[in-house]
Amino acid sequence: MQKLFESLGYEGDRRFNTLNGHQRLLYLEGVNGRQIDVFIDRMKMCHVIELANRLGHEGPTLTPADLLLSKLQVYEVNMKDLVDTAALLLDHPIADHDDDAINGAYLARLTSDDWGLHRTLQLNSGRVRDAARVLEVDSRLIDQRLDELWSKIDAQPKSLRWKVRARVGDRVSWYQLPEEVRQPYQKD
């Protein structure tokens, strides 16, 4: 993998990859400041998202639902993540499958067992709605798709673990703050 990224003009972040290579690798492109994160079996940022069983689909990247999770599960979400999320919502309908759609059934299952993930997605959905208005994109379509997604999430029965954690609520932190490697699109 390292040779592939190097042939494409990316350089591995040696320190980060040495410390985190068992779960995540980071490659940076020096000219345009692009960053590629490679997650190994799971995405561990503010929440842990298991990906091992989600990688068998056709396509060069994660499914739209997993890409959406990669953005919305970040508690301290930045404008780049909000823009990316808006683009995903504009480009992909909500459905119960992964074929060029955001799999709402999958997201509902994940959030029905993890109150913290549910809460972070809930907060960030509001932030995406606000950002869509500022960005002057089709905020009605974004609202419609988020409403459809939350209809599925809210309809999914919640686990006992979810219900117990919900009683604690926001009084206790429900997320981890990952190490910030660098700001998106900024060279070192």
Language-model segments: residues:
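The feature captures the alpha-helical scaffold/lid subdomain characteristic of nucleotidyltransferase
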Residues: 34, 40, 44-60, 64-188
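Conserved catalytic core of two-metal-ion nucleotidyltransferases
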Residues: 2-46
